[in-house]
Amino acid sequence: AAGEPTGVLLEKAVRLVESHLPVESAEEIRGALLEAQAEAHRLGLTGVHSVEVTGLEDFTRMELDGVLRLRVLQTIPLPRLEHAIGAGLRSGFGGEWLRIGGVKMFTDGALGSRTAWMRQPYEGGAAGDVGICTLEPEEFRDHVRRAAAAGIASTVHAIGDAAVEMAIDVLGGAERLPAMPHRIEHVQLCPPDLWARAGRSGLVGSMQPIHLMTDIPAAERHWGHERARGAYAFAPLARAGMTLAFGSDVPVESCDPRLGLFAAVRRVGWDGAPAEGWWMENAVTAEQALRAYTEGPAFAAGLPHRQGRLLPGYDADLVAWDVDPLDCEPDALCQMRCVLTMVGGEVVQRA
């Protein structure tokens, strides 16, 4: 604020140094992806929705070489939207292992850095301390229209309540595509007055329960307790009719689904506080959380008719645990052991 450099680069300022970062070779990237794939199988994951900028080329090579054994939905970075349109890419294009998702856009920053875009100032902040809007409404609307006209859905990062409201309004009013729905990533602060609008919007709420285990102290500090009533509002949004698709935001947090299930049900921090849970009216049951990790992502990927459920004719993507997650104490969810992971009828991990 005083015009002195702090050494911290917020949001778009990171572009000042991005071009100077060392570039990994194709072999290094493949090695890392194969390690990550094995770890995902060990944890009981059969698919991922990827937002990595270079992911499409790397996953394509793995698929062509027959080594990709995760169902991958790959988003298109906004700077590459025109290239994707020119190349004829559409949401839903692809094959057995790799498919095209939506165009990824960012409308704000994050909670911890106080750059998430807010309706009202942060706690203890000045009148203008409302975070950062990284995509102006008209520009945002134009990108969504342009993508939809080309058959590409939108996948939009929105954390603060102002960003979430804008995303609901713009995406909810956009052309709906047959391939897959538009989705809001994170939806971390969605106040009660937005719940019904979110439910009517037809949008997917792509949320990461594990974040709340880290964010509880930050939310209380930066948003205040009462405003935090709308934080990670899983149950109210589901009741309103919004389809929830749970994930992890790895590598920001662990991709271990057990931790996400636990967080969605118990709503406590890593230190176990508050013992009674944080805004428990927003908690979901273990069954609701499990559906949000299975049926939700399948719906978000435009594949509710062939993935996300154990039914005849569906892809044989399944996981076996040593205990029933629907018949154990919430605290036991973190200790479950994945004893088998199957993708496409092939056992890819057995404990």
What is each residue range found by the language model?
Residues A1-G86, G101, M105, A110-A163, ...:
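Divalent metal-binding segments
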Residues R61, H83-A87, L111-M118, A167, ...:
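Short acidic, glycine/serine/threonine-rich loops at helix termini
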